[in-house]
Amino acid sequence: MSVSGTDVEMVVPAITVRDLCFSWPKGDRVLHNCSLKVPKGEFWMLLGTNGSGKSTLLRLLAELLSPQSGEIDIQGRLGFVFQNPDHQLVMPTVGADVAFGLVEEKLSIAQVRERVEEALAAVNLLDLQRRPIYALSGGQKQRIAIAGAIARHCEVLLLDEPTALLDPDSQLDLVAQVQRLIKNRGLTALWVTHRLDELNYCDGAFLLEKGEVVDRGDPVRLKQRLMQIQEA
């Protein structure tokens, strides 16, 4: 299927996917010749109906799954944020959880403390450093997961429907904060969503149908297209 819409030439992509194919062991095809590019320093969203392959694509990018064919190129250290943050918050307190991701770097205690405080300040949760994880709201848990990626100096963020379990106010607070983080810190992000109001915060979007990118570009245009489909 050919891709419609304006395909802007991206000189420096941070995420490149070329002709990616993936099927489950039983033979169900999920992605077929899927290709996309996310420019460095931009915030893009990935849209599509349930079963279109959005979450599978993110897991392939994060090397949680392996494709049958195709190429993936990611420029920079990668951070992944799950739909349910309880899947990745493993330590009892906020500060300890952010620090846990730094173990492999063999930093000094002072360096770890500096990284943790910098990351929590970036998501406006520095005052919760000693707070138990169980005492956090859903939105705060997602921000802690993002802080973990910032502490590890990740340059590319993959976020799999991070607002799916949040109320509308917390949803928009989170997407607005991620937008600011990306711009202020020069990050690149690909955010899976099915909520059209989140498109107001991104630089561009991809529409995935049956495992293929069928449209890409201006989020306002894509939002209008999807609203027309829903109203039909």
What residues fall within each predicted segment?
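Conserved beta-strand-loop-alpha-helix hinge in the C-terminal portion
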Residues: 212-232
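A short, flexible loop at the N-terminus of ABC-type nucleotide-binding domains that lies
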Residues: 2-17, 21-33, 109
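Helix-to-loop junction immediately C-terminal to a conserved catalytic motif
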Residues: 62
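Catalytic Walker B motif of ABC-type/P-loop ATPase nucleotide-binding domains
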Residues: 157-161
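Conserved ABC ATPase "signature" region
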Residues: 110-128
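Conserved ABC ATPase signature
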Residues: 132-136, 140
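The feature captures the beta-strand-to-loop junction immediately N-terminal to the Walker
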Residues: 47-49
